[in-house]
Regions:
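A structural signal for long, well-ordered, hydrophobic/aromatic- and basic-residue-enriched core segments
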Residues: 75-93, 128
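Short, amphipathic alpha-helical interaction segments positioned at domain boundaries
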Residues: 146-166
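Minor-groove-contacting beta-hairpin "wing" of winged helix-turn-helix DNA-binding domains
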Residues: 138-145
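Short amphipathic alpha-helical interaction segments
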Residues: 112-128
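Long, low-complexity, charged/polar intrinsically disordered regions in eukaryotic proteins
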Residues: 5-82
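A short, conserved structural fragment
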Residues: 127-138
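Short acidic, hydrophobic short linear motifs in intrinsically disordered regions
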Residues: 86-90, 96-111
Length: 166
């Protein structure tokens, strides 16, 4: 279900740094373009040794009108980037995988952060979204889900349905 971010999250308010009689100098604070969360979820981590989960959010970028995803937290530890990743970048990586099994490391290219857990945690999120499934060869290899294209299109259509609902 879609939600607005809470009041506790960042607000775009300029901060007055210094002032004289003629001019007020302000410092630009970063803008949060992801105030409209359209889906939140959790996905089981890839390792068979744990029952812990990775939590993710999907939001609409308020200027680009594009879907982005981020890993918001995880159970049991493991550092990861909380950067927002364009969903179309992830689907572009998945689109070229074809029928062959692939490693989580194919996801490294969508991150600017370099945490070792990023690719694996994002692959877990993609499994949670039903885009990919475990390969028969290994718990750490993936293949596209049989209904990948349908699931991808449904996911990408969230931006259309949410913007029409406003």
């Amino acid at each position: 279900m879609a939600r607005k971010t809470s009041n506790q999250e960042e607000l775009n308010q300029p901060e007055i740094v210094g002032e004289n009689e003629q001019v007020a100098v302000t410092e630009e604070l970063p803008v949060n373009h992801f105030t409209y969360i359209v889906r939140e979820g959790k996905a089981k981590k890839l390792s068979p040794k744990t029952e812990n989960h990775v939590f993710y959010e999907i939001a609409i970028h308020d200027e680009e009108n594009e879907l982005y995803i981020r890993m918001s937290s995880n159970e049991g530890g493991g550092l990861h980037s909380k950067e927002w990743i364009p969903l179309k970048d992830i689907t572009a990586v998945l689109d070229v995988q074809g029928d062959k099994p692939f490693k989580s490391s194919v996801m490294k290219c969508v991150f600017s952060g370099q945490s070792a857990n990023n690719a694996g945690f994002l692959a877990a999120c993609c499994r949670g979204l039903g885009l990919i499934i475990q390969s028969e060869k290994s718990v750490f290899l993936h293949v596209l889900a049989p209904d990948y294209e349908q699931r991808r299109d449904e996911l990408l259509s969230l931006v259309d349905s949410e913007t029409k609902a406003e």
